[in-house]
């Protein structure tokens, strides 16, 4: 099968797109050895700064550098404005869905989404039922994963509402590009992103009804794959980075242990999953959480960002209903479309999936990080048949989608520059207002032909420029 990919830098006639012309001129005039030297400098600087991630399942548990590519992904400002509006619209609808789900459940009563699809979902938290949240916001920090098909149309691949990660790489990639190639930023107007930590802190503070709430970042600890990001964001916001053992609950209030005695905590930006937050309420074996945290939360004495139970809205089995959520709650047409999705829990759609596995991408509804998925066109017959057996055994645990022709962007590889597939994760902050920092994290599949961009699967990152037209 011949696939047509949308190239971010070159049009169908091989001409450089207008928003890339300045970069293309610079690239043509810059000696190859200088580019190679700067790339080596970037690797060294990232290593010194500790910009790493830990690969789960790695026997050595080693920290790895996320490969950084110095050819940016560039988006014209006019195009970005549409993407931005689409992301804001989508996250607003998802927050309205969560408010409705944990209160009146109008969308279920209207027959738009089946009750069992959400109420039997393992991410649904009965403890949240009837609990009112300040501003009715459940997902304060959201990541919306976008891809472009062969004709350049943006699609939402998935929503990330639990503990979306990657924003630290977005910020560090920009700092690295400005340090190594300042002349590029002097030659054109590229939207800044360095104000993200200030926006994040403002969002977290606005999540509390208090005038000047105390904010902390709760991390599972240094062995977590995203620990660098937890420490980075706490430092950039000027707030404390804490582990569960640093906090305790007394009289349904959360306190932080300090050398000066207990200090009240009002907002927790938590970077661990629901199951580990409170051993008294969730997983009793958790050593990462804070005993009594749920009780304090239900009393309204502490804010958790993101809220407990947000995961039900970004579950892949709920994803097919998001465009209907937009119509139901906002009375608007979706600006960004979903990828067509087959739900294996439905017998007719299951039959279609099983008959077309070599052409489809199949995902576990609870999967993440590029794990638990089948990319049909890139799989062997044995891999496809093994996955077929898994789907038949538990069809409700899988969805399937057509294999998209993900857009490509020129990327440095071992033997020069070649196109590699990319996606985009803009970060949406929901507080007094809903805001998106221009661009986001561009992830790139460095292996030739690969469509999997996750760092856990060998993917890298690029700086993302929003360039004035």
Predicted regions and their residues:
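Preference for protein termini
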Residues: 1-469
